């Protein structure tokens, strides 16, 4: 497995694989890898000849400098895991490699509406940072396929629209959220939970599943469902942050034409912000 830190070497290796007719997959990450990331990698391994994983803690998508400073950097451990899973190349650039002129003078990629609604409303600039760095990685790697988890659902839809709008010749493969045996969505943030918080954390997905079951049975009073969910989260020990039920394709409010809904939940548990989502088929 190659570990590459610079753009020229990355391009050299990609050029070689292209000349050999290889099918290339890109899995963008910020490191601190867990089994959810490994599922992305394993899915890519089954569909491509070459798997490239980027590890870059993107400063552009952090709203608060202290969050950026606290984000775990575990490159050695990450590379060991990726080697065991048969990854061909890890691209782990420094900030200067991605933003050689600094972020103040960087050209941005902004996806209208999707970047400022829902979670984007409370994290101004976050999704612009995501779309900019992913666009840059796409330009550098020029993959045939790219892999994103469904856990960050708004991010997934944002990248999907960016690929369509900018005419990237890239197939986006979405991979279902990986959960532990209690139903808790795997996340790097779970490492920040105390023992008591770990015990409480699965309640988030249980409450979400309860909403999904009611909607699958025909319930459409979404505001009432969300009010009940907020009360249940409070009772369980969470501080609700953002609770939405939206059209899964557009993330707009549900309407009579919506075929699939997505329940989007974010809540604080102690000092950790937990997020989760679940899609619901509305056509049955």
From Swiss-Prot:
InterPro entries: Cyt_trans-like (IPR004821), Pantoate_ligase (IPR003721), Pantoate_ligase_C (IPR042176), Rossmann-like_a/b/a_fold (IPR014729). ATP binds at residues 30-37, 149-152, 178, 186-189. Beta-alanine binds at residue 61. Keywords: ATP-binding, Cytoplasm, Ligase, Nucleotide-binding, Pantothenate biosynthesis. It catalyses: (R)-pantoate + beta-alanine + ATP = (R)-pantothenate + AMP + diphosphate + H(+). (R)-pantoate binds at residues 61, 155. The keyword Ligase applies. The active site is at 37 (proton donor). The keyword Ligase applies. GO terms for molecular function: ATP binding; pantoate-beta-alanine ligase activity. It comes from the Bacteria. One of its GO terms (biological process) is pantothenate biosynthetic process. It is an enzyme of class 6 (ligase). It is found in: Cytoplasm. Its EC number is 6.3.2.1. GO terms for cellular component: cytosol. It holds the Pfam family Pantoate_ligase. Pathway: Cofactor biosynthesis; (R)-pantothenate biosynthesis; (R)-pantothenate from (R)-pantoate and beta-alanine: step 1/1. Belongs to the pantothenate synthetase family. NCBIfam families: cyt_tran_rel (TIGR00125), panC (TIGR00018). Homodimer. The reaction proceeds by a bi uni uni bi ping pong mechanism. Catalyzes the condensation of pantoate with beta-alanine in an ATP-dependent reaction via a pantoyl-adenylate intermediate. HAMAP family: PanC. This is Pantothenate synthetase. It comes from Photorhabdus laumondii subsp. laumondii (strain DSM 15139 / CIP 105565 / TT01).
